[in-house]
């Protein structure tokens, strides 16, 4: 009944994804990365995603080996519109986009003795903790996200209401990227709603444990949640 009565959801998703794929098409001539590598998620290149707002630590704050680099020459950053391995002649500001000031580009040679958090004119695109929730590496990526959203997410939103669901969803999504921005590899772009959806999974687990004795088949429900985690995590664990 839910699926039959809510036909508009897939139209909204389709329009949203078509809008997201328009920008990569303008930059590289194709909405899907096919050169120099093929994106198995059927989506744009990581450089396009960085330019669109993916979590990319060098765009957000000073990074060891970037701002304090004093050997090996200045870093040549890939250009957002690159379709080859040779187009590595952009500045960090050009890669990051969003009108990042040129004065925030790393200066070579950097100062090895100055603490990273005290560098002047360091990048500060803090909104990259939020924007990546709405970006995805490709159609397969958003497909797995929507699968979980329309199963466990739907049931939890009905149970707790849209306002509480909204608060949990975005809190988990934002702080997931905060943790990734502090502890994940600094040179990898990250996108997607995995952090938000793992918050939804946590709510489902809490609900299961609180109502364990009232359920007809609690172990079956628990197994279903574990299956969702396994199916959802492995295809996207390198993206988010």
Label each region the model flagged:
Residues 123-131, 171, 175, 223-230:
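Alpha-helical membrane-protein architecture signal
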Residues 162, 206-223:
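Alpha-helical transmembrane bundle and helix-membrane interface signal
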Residues 5-9, 143, 166-170, 225-226:
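Hydrophobic alpha-helical transmembrane segments
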């Amino acid at each position: 009944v839910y699926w039959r009565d809510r036909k508009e959801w897939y139209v909204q998703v389709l329009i949203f994804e078509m809008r997201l794929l328009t920008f990569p098409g303008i930059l590289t001539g194709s909405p899907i990365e096919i050169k120099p590598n093929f994106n198995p998620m059927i989506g744009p290149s990581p450089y396009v995603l960085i330019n669109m707002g993916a979590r990319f630590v060098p765009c957000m704050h000073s990074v060891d080996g970037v701002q304090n680099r004093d050997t090996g020459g200045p870093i040549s950053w890939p250009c957002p519109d690159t379709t080859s391995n040779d187009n590595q002649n952009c500045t960090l500001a050009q890669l990051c986009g969003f009108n990042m000031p040129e004065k925030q580009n790393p200066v070579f040679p950097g100062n090895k003795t100055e603490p990273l958090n005290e560098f002047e004119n360091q990048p500060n695109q803090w909104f990259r903790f939020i924007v990546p929730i709405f970006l995805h590496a490709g159609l397969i990526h958003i497909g797995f996200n929507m699968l979980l959203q329309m199963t466990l997410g739907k049931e939890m939103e009905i149970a707790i209401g849209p306002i509480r669901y909204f608060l949990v969803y975005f809190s988990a999504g934002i702080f997931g990227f905060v943790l990734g921005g502090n502890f994940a590899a600094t040179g990898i772009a990250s996108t997607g709603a995995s952090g938000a959806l793992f918050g939804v999974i946590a709510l489902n687990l809490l609900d299961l444990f609180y109502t364990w004795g009232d359920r007809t088949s609690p172990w079956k429900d628990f197994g279903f949640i574990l299956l969702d985690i396994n199916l959802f995590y492995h295809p996207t664990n390198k993206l988010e």
